[in-house]
Amino acid sequence: MSDGKPSGEDTVDARKEKGQGTPFLTDAGVDYTDAKPHSDAFQYNMNYGSLGQCVIINNKNFHRKTSMGVRNGTDEDAKSVMATFSKLGFKVSIANDQTVSEMKNLLTKVSREDHSKSAMFVCVLLSHGDDGMIYGTDGAIPMKTLFELFRGDRCTSLVGKPKLFFIQACRGTGLDPGVESDGESEMETKRIPVEADFLYAYSTAPGYYAWRNVIQGSWFISSLCEMLLKYGKQLEIMQIMTRVNHKVAFDFESYSNMPGFGGKKQIPCIVSMLTKDLYFPK
């Protein structure tokens, strides 16, 4: 990490390999009517009674059968996320150490609630992971299984509204050694794709480890919270996420006692299916 000597070891959110130590739809569309006209056809409407919910799932301790270690530092992430999204105006809730069934049941319950008076929805997942998978305390579940609960054909009160998922978890076991660089609408009924209006912000690129400092929390979540607090009332969400990418890419480097794990880099991966610009209300 930058800013002088790191205050704790960096580790990863993934399964331990053998001999390794601890660190480590068819698019059918749905009909909807936008009852509130937009002043800007390319900007999401934030004029609702509530900004919306931010649901945090924070998994730290795992059953022995999973071979997953304790995610030290994740409570720091959870605390930062709670403070950041509360300040932005969200109604924040947190569920700690959730099994696979508990994760699915929780998000199923939330997806079936009435969000008609909310402008958007946010979910933050803090856990171990693998390619396309996220871990509950007792095993793994495909991330898509959780995401699709909020599709337009399943959660109709969030149709046409932004649904943001932030995922701090590994997506494989690849290590990035880094490389040297030289410098720097109207009221009408429409049909939209059921997968529209989602944004997935992954802590790392597909196939790679995601780093987490055991004392300070993860690189991605700490950077996300810092940029949201700094620019959340000014910039569009993709501009904010670009700054998150920049901070993680340039300001962090792994410090680890594990052979081959030191001096590694990380780049978040932002997948957007948003159909308009998203600005948090001032």
Description of each model-found segment:
Residues 1-282:
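Cysteine endopeptidase catalytic domains of the caspase/legumain-like
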